[in-house]
Every structure is written in C-alpha cells, then in structure tokens.
C-alpha cells in the first residue's frame, strides 16, 4: 500500500515523510499508537504538527498521531490548486489513511478543515469521534455581517486591524509555544510565504470551498462530535452542519485558535475517548 502512494521517508526522521498525491506532494508526520489522532489544519501557512503540538505533547505515548500539511503550507512543497476541488482533497487524505493502514481514528480539525472532515467521515474507515475546533460553517463563510454582525467577532477584527494580522498572530504564538518551536514556526511560514510570492499570476494556493460543498454534507447520528468554540458562537454551531444527536459543545477561549488556549481540555477529552 505504501509503495502505491510513493511514500518517501526521511533518513533522519522516520516519523516525517512526503506522500505524492493527485493534489500535490504532502508532508506528513506520523507516530503509531494504540489509537490514532488525525489532525488537519485550517487556512494559513503554519505546519500542522506544530499547530497541534500543544495538544499532542499532553497525550500519553500510547496515543499515536497523523498530521498532514496541505499543498503550499507548512513543510509541503508548492503546487497550484487550480482545478482541484474539495472532493480531491478529501480523497488525498483518505488515501494517506489507507496507505498507513489506519483502520480507525479520532479526527481533530480546525476551522476550514471542518468541511473536509464532514466529507471524510463518509469514507469507509471508522472514525471514533470528531473533535472540531471552531469549524467553518456555511453560515459564517457566506454570511452578510452588515445584516447580522457578531459584536464579539467585530471586536476581534478591530484588534487584528489595529496591531496588524502578523503582529496579532505573533502575539498568540509567543504565549503558546516555547521559543525554539515558535522560531521554527515562523521560519517555515516566512520561507513558504517567500516561495508563494514568486509564483506566476493565477497560481491558486488552496482549494476553493463552495456553497455546494456545504449543501452536499451529511453527518451520521452515530458519530460523537465535540465542537470547541467561543461562547458567542454557540447558537451558530447548534444550528450548523456539525450538530447531530451526539454533538456536544464545549465553550471557552477568546480567539480562534482554541487548539492552543484550550489544549488541556482537548487533550483530556482525547485521553477519555
């Protein structure tokens, strides 16, 4: 199975390797365990392993993990996503799970990967539970905030605008990560940003997610779903694609990166599953 996917393992780091897929070459970090946590990023250039590290480092060694950098992010090479849709991205993730012979897993996703998660759950590999961290909803992605604003979100956006997106994000990484990890995160993101700046006009960084992608989603009632979100978004998620008869909302935090501020709660939940 692994040879079919053209896995290339690094001699120096047997847990990190690249997988050639139809959407591009993906950098993967993998550790075997009695149960496997699959972690998928939202938007942005941050490498997925480091993004979820505040959770991973709180888990016992018996729990394994799989993190995947999508094309043009983290450690994955540059590859235009022109002509590639969400279904193609889902299929690439599914092929990696199959290639590693993962028969069941816990899925932990942030932001935009929530939409990917709902499609991935329909694939024939058992998902024990979905942990969705402020997953993207159709309501928020296509909302007209001039008609129905979130005062709390508007306040956050004002704060980001005042200090600048990079300074805002750097403030969060500084209080979350040890100095060496934070330095590596910014080194990788800046390197990737420079590579992307050199691409020709029309280069597409990420897959487009359409309203039709949301319309085709369905969530089975037998899958336990845990949604971590800020308190002001509670109603949005109760009315969302992520709500079934087994959904539980866990409220907390005051920014979008709850995998950092709420990592203790998330790790405790994973240990219990």
What are these regions (language model features)?
Residues 27-75:
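Conserved HGGG/HGGXW glycine-rich cap/lid loop of the alpha/beta-hydrolase fold
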Residues 131-163:
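Flexible "cap/lid" loop of the alpha/beta hydrolase fold
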Residues 254-263:
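Catalytic histidine-centered segment of alpha/beta-hydrolase-like enzymes
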Residues 103-141:
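Conserved hydrolase catalytic core segment
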Residues 7-25:
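N-terminal cap/lid segment of alpha/beta-hydrolase-fold proteins
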Residues 188-245, 250:
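Conserved serine/cysteine hydrolase catalytic core
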Residues 67-106:
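Active-site loop/oxyanion-hole signature of alpha/beta-hydrolase fold enzymes
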Residues 49-51, 76-81, 142-143:
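Conserved catalytic-core motifs of eukaryotic protein kinase domains, centered on the activation segment
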